[in-house]
């Protein structure tokens, strides 16, 4: 789930050329069908310049391999997609293929109303389950109101990890070593503050940096061996958000906000603008996701790592998963249209598409082909290694807002109150849990 919206990610020209060149080379065998004089309406959320360049080239390649087919592309921000997708499909004038946010509020609601078609047939036909693990595909499964089981309604092209961005030059200038444990991170923040350096870049006016910070800190304190409780929450099996760990995470973030650990004026800065400030050299750390790799690579001093875990946590979890899923809507009325949509999605999650994304500096969910030799940025190299480790350790965590249709709004409404000290950490977590318990009650 890509949580970023408005800003444009400007890639260096040579990276855009590399991405386009690799995408152009991707005209290989990907199940070509007979030519069909047809249009395919597609909505995606790749609004960043670097992302959009890759999608545009991939679309051109698909059209070239399918004479007569025209991709009618509409790019929408994450927030716009949430507002308009379900209504557009319901009204009959939306996309045939779309990106859709996983979780109860979007994919779950659309499945419930019959607005999305299962893609299990295409998983089997194209072998998508060989490209991505079952635990990743489970994030696109719904059976009635049950999340994580049943039929599969989508598949994603990009992987996502929420982690710790750091500016190595700022740390070196302040005499601060890269933290290896959570206690070392806390000590580093104190030292940076003493030196007059903003420890964290933050922007809370728009987007969801604070949400990711709270979730990432909490899940870094969970060992993968003990992940069942979190899984149950996200997949609607029950439990409570009102835990000591969630309260402590909210308390720590509130203390940072109140204690001068965030960039001055963060309350009036959007998340995307905060990222641009960080790229320009403001702030030592920033907690967010790999979807900013395309922007972050413009500053060679910026690195990326997992949130340092406390002692005793051997396989810490990281918030993350995959970006919005490619899905087929109910507007694919006949089998020919459905099969064309399935072919399109197959190409978007193919090894060649993964190679194009990697060349542009983004983290693909599908493994790169064995003979691929893209020039990987240091950030992407770090991201790929983290992705491998998290999957090997079964330590890929969850976005908290996936747990109910209204959880994102509940968190967004209460986060400014938490950061400003107008509500306690206990009240913040209680609001999340009340939302969740109401959802569980409505499901019955």
Where are these regions (language model features)?
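Extracytoplasmic/periplasmic solute-binding protein
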Residues: 144-157, 162, 186-238
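C-terminal capping/gating helix-and-loop segments adjacent to ligand/active sites or protein-protein/ligand interfaces
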Residues: 363-370, 383-437
């Amino acid at each position: 789930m890509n949580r970023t919206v408005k800003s444009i990610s400007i890639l260096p020209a040579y990276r855009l050329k590399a991405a386009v060149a690799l995408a152009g080379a991707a005209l290989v065998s990907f199940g070509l069908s007979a030519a069909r004089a047809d249009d395919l309406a597609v909505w995606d959320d790749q609004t960043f310049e670097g992302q959009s360049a890759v999608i545009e080239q991939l679309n051109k390649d698909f059209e070239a391999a399918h004479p007569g087919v025209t991709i009618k592309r509409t790019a929408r921000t994450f927030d716009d997609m949430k507002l308009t997708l379900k209504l557009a499909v319901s009204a009959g004038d939306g996309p045939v293929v779309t990106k859709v946010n996983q979780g109860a509020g979007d994919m779950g609601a659309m499945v419930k109303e019959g607005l999305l078609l299962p893609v299990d047939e295409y998983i089997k036909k194209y072998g998508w389950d060989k490209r991505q693990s079952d635990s990743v595909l489970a994030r696109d499964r719904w059976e009635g109101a049950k999340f994580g089981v049943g039929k599969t309604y989508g598949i994603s092209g990009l992987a996502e990890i929420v982690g710790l961005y750091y500016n190595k030059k700022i740390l070196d200038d302040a005499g601060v070593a890269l933290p290896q444990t959570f206690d070392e991170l806390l000590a580093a923040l104190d030292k940076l503050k003493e030196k007059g350096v903003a420890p964290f870049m933050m922007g809370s006016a728009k987007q969801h940096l604070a949400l990711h910070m709270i979730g990432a800190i909490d899940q870094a304190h969970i060992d993968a061996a003990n992940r069942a409780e979190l899984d149950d929450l996200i997949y609607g099996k029950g439990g409570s958000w009102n835990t000591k760990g969630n309260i402590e995470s909210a308390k720590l973030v509130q203390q940072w906000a109140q204690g001068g650990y965030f960039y001055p004026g963060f309350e009036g800065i959007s998340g995307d603008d905060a990222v641009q400030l960080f790229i320009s050299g403001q702030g030592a750390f920033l907690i967010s996701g790999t979807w900013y790799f395309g922007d972050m690579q413009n500053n060679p001093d910026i690195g990326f790592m997992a949130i340092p875990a406390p002692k005793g946590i051997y396989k810490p979890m990281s918030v993350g998963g995959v970006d919005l899923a490619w899905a087929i809507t109910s507007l694919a009325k006949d089998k020919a249209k459905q099969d064309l949509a399935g072919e399109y999605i197959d190409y978007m999650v193919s090894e060649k598409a993964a190679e194009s994304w990697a060349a542009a500096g983004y983290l693909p969910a599908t493994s790169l082909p064995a003979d691929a030799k893209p020039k990987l940025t240091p950030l992407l190299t770090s991201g790929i290694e983290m992705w491998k480790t998290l999957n090997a350790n079964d330590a890929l965590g969850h976005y908290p807002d996936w747990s109910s249709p209204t959880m994102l709004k509940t968190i967004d409404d209460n986060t400014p109150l938490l950061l400003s000290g107008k509500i306690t950490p206990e009240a913040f977590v209680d609001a999340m849990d009340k939302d969740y318990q109401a959802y569980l009650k409505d499901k019955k």
